[in-house]
Amino acid sequence: MEKVWTVKIAGPAGAGVKSAGLLLAQILNESGYFLKDYSEYPSLVRGGHNTYQISFSKGEVFGVYQKLDVLISLSAGHWQEHKKEMKKGGLIFTDNEGENNLPLNEMSLQLGSRIYANTITLGLLVYLFALDKKLSLKIVSKHFGENENNQRAFESGFKYGENNFREVVSSEEVNSKKVSSKKKIIVDGNEAVGWGLYKAGLNLYAAYPMTPATGVLHFLAKNQDEFNIKVVHPEDEIAAASIACGNSMAGGRSATGTS
């Protein structure tokens, strides 16, 4: 069985936890790895405790593993409740809190804002797992556009790893060569539901946005022209169910979703 590595990024809402996790997932996917990931977050615009966890391997991965190889805290204190999740020899990176030091506050402010902490973290992770730097920068640039500070942030995180954690790089087991040439895509659960509805012949989707089902509505709305379906956002869930039932009674294939 192929070795599975698991990484968790933790921090407050608004710190870019999910962005860093999604970008790492894209880099791993483009590098040929198999992966499973998930995020946890409260119903807050800022603050609270958010995490993004990824398990990846050269072989197929069928779930997110509980024990962590690497834990990175984007802000003070967000690593503490996950200490017991660490594997023996696992690495915890914090900002001057007694673990492996990653001075995210200082490094990001040198670039002008705390918002770059997540991209610095991504650069460090790419270094630690000996992933392809050129490919990673291409994905970062595509995601953030022409903002050169994000590229500088990635470079600073990568260089910090080179200068301080050379001895812990997993290059013997993880490498920058493409593991699998088989083309794979990354989808979340809601997108998978949306694809399933489309492939099943859906012609109308009516829904009121309510977490966690909102993603299905957004996915189908974004693709309604390509899929040749009608997406309706009515005033409430009862109206959505009524529209779906009416379309079905008229001979259409319809669906609705809520939480």
Please place each PLM-identified region on the residue numbering.
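Phosphate/diphosphate-binding loops
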Residues: 74, 78, 84-86, 236-238, ...
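Short, basic, glycine/proline-bearing loop/turn elements
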Residues: 46, 63-69, 227-230, 251-258
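Short, surface-exposed connector motifs at secondary-structure boundaries
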Residues: 6, 198-204, 224-228, 249-255
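Active-site nucleophile and cofactor-binding loops and adjacent substrate-binding regions
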Residues: 12, 39-42, 184-189, 208-210, ...
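Contiguous, well-ordered alpha-helical segments that form the cores/surfaces of helical PPI scaffolds
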Residues: 121-126, 191-199, 214-218, 239-249
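Active-site cofactor/cluster-binding pocket
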Residues: 1-200, 204
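Glycine-rich phosphate/ribose-binding loops and adjacent secondary-structure elements
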Residues: 21, 217-251
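Short secondary-structure capping/turn micro-motifs that flank functional sites
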Residues: 44-45, 213-214, 221
